[in-house]
Amino acid sequence: LSKGGIEASRVLAEALDAPVCVGYQHNDAFPGNHPLYAGPLGYNGSKAGMELISKADVVLCLGTRLNPFSTLPGYGIDYWPTEAKIIQVDLNPDRIGLTKKVTVGIVGDAAKVATAISSKLADGAGDTGRADRKNLVAQTKSSWAQELTSMTEEQDDPGTDWNVRARAAKPDWMAPRMAWRAIQAALPVEAIISSDIGNNCAIGNAYPSFNEARKYLAPGLFGPCGYGLPSIVGAKIGRPDVPVVGFAGDGAFGISVNELTAIGRGDWPAITQIVFRNYQWGAEKRNSTLWFDDNFVGTELDEGVSYAGIANACGLKGVVARTQDELTAALAQAIKDQMENGITTLIEAMINQELGDPFRRDAMKNPVEVAGINKDDMKQQVV
């Protein structure tokens, strides 16, 4: 949101006691400690936010283009309130009504529009059902917080069993959500984080919350693979007084691993980078398991490569974490080293090969036969 947009949104939300959801990977667009904050919508977002918005009769969409990643179903819930009145506010007129049908479109600055609406509210606006609404928000958030804490396993689609096999293959390894819980236990509330594209970073969408703006760097719909490391370096250059942590899967990290050769130079500030190590391109593999009968092509990564080893070779500190306790301890020490000793740490978090939901289930479908192609021509791949 533009300058002043978060504060203007807070004032309006409090006047109505209306729950506030944010878009995919925009977890810093509203204070996470606010009682009306319901979390991010979209892929692996907040079930609380999804359940609350599904009950809405009016939705005010401030400064958002309502992109598919922020509105697609999650956890089996098709939550977008198709019968509600939708008011969309955006500076770009081309985005109004682009992805969702809107009742009212407003071309304008989110902060100015929110302030104007607040100033025009009638006395008693929002009073009807106010107490019940506040209780519903609190209860829904509490229920989701308990459920999220207990979530460990990723679910398979009917007719597939990749995640069952992944757990059986590495029963002692962390699941992705176990790693995210371990990270949350040591991540400073004031930290700036960056997220690369990919399955394991996206699984973590529901976990981080922020009490200040400009704390979450994410690639958004551009989808640039390798974004996580260089963006967190830039964040540290801009805010050397703030702890920073970058996140990337091992596939995406391989795109920017060469930056490790530069980070160790004396005039570069120290950072912390976590790499989720499961030796696969996860998002692509999930599509393969669901729509191509486990016919993986180019999704496997070399298990002989050690990113922690590469970091050490570049004069940095490389650490391997195999358990939740090890990961929490490694991150806590890395933050201390970053802020007090000027040491850059790369943490390889060793996780099993479980896969989250496909990114765009709504945009994919089963393949169809193509004329002239015989399935007998297909060769079995050894994995």
Across the structure, where does each feature detected by a protein language model lie?
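Short glycine-rich anion-binding loops that position phosphate/pyrophosphate groups of nucleotides
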Residues: 1, 25-27, 64-67, 198-200, ...
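Glycine-rich phosphate/diphosphate-binding loop of Rossmann-like nucleotide-binding domains
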Residues: 1-14
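Thiamine diphosphate
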Residues: 6, 36, 43, 50-55, ...
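Active-site diphosphate/adenylate-binding microenvironment
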Residues: 9, 143-241
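A short, gly/pro- and small-residue-rich
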Residues: 11-17, 71-91, 213-214, 360-374
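Short internal beta-strands
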Residues: 19-24, 87-90, 273-276
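General beta-strand structural signal in soluble alpha/beta enzymes
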Residues: 21-23, 61-62, 88, 108, ...
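Glycine-rich, acidic loop regions that bind phosphate or pyrophosphate groups
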Residues: 26-145, 331-335, 348
